């Protein structure tokens, strides 16, 4: 069989550059991108923070009102879910939080016993998809938490 190479594209009998490029594009579409998002909420300054490692992006929002730390943690996750649904629809997402309460409630391992958290939990669950996972990490590893502490 007569074949030769031009750059990365093999050209020869029954094997054209167009077919090769088409196969490459189809394979790339099937590959899933993994995105890591770090979130945190803190009562000092009533702020939430989101760090998107894939885009090297940090977002800090100030929230008004008399909110507890757990409410701010939920608001950070809600903001992350809205951010994800607008930017990373095709990606596999992992949200990292240092709040065991929030992570375990969203993962269905712990019950919600505070009436103020129930509506926030419900909003989170409406926005969650099968491509989004939420995991707990220690405070020292949470990039968003480190930023909020400064």
Language model region names:
Residues 2-8:
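Intrinsic-disorder-associated, low-complexity terminal segments enriched in Asp/Asn/His/Tyr and depleted
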Residues 5, 64-65, 112:
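Generic detector of short alpha-helix boundary/capping microenvironments
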Residues 15, 19-71, 82-83:
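RNase H-like nuclease fold core
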Residues 42-44, 78-150:
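RNase H catalytic domain
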Residues 73, 77:
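Short, conserved alpha-helix that lines the donor NDP-sugar binding/gating region
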């Amino acid at each position: 069989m007569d074949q030769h190479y031009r750059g990365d594209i093999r050209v020869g009998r029954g094997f054209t550059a167009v077919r090769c490029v088409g196969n490459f594009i189809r394979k790339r579409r099937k590959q899933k991108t993994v995105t890591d998002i770090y979130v945190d909420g803190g009562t000092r300054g009533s702020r939430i923070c989101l760090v998107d490692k894939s885009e090297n992006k940090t977002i800090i929002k100030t929230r008004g009102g008399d909110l507890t730390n757990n409410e701010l943690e939920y608001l950070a996750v809600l903001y992350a879910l809205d951010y994800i649904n607008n930017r990373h629809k095709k990606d596999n997402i992992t949200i990292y939080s240092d709040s065991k309460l929030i992570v375990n409630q969203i993962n269905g391992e712990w019950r919600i016993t505070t009436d103020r958290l129930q509506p926030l939990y419900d909003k989170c669950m409406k926005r969650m998809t099968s491509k989004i996972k939420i995991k707990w990490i220690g405070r020292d590893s949470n990039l968003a938490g480190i930023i909020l502490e400064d």
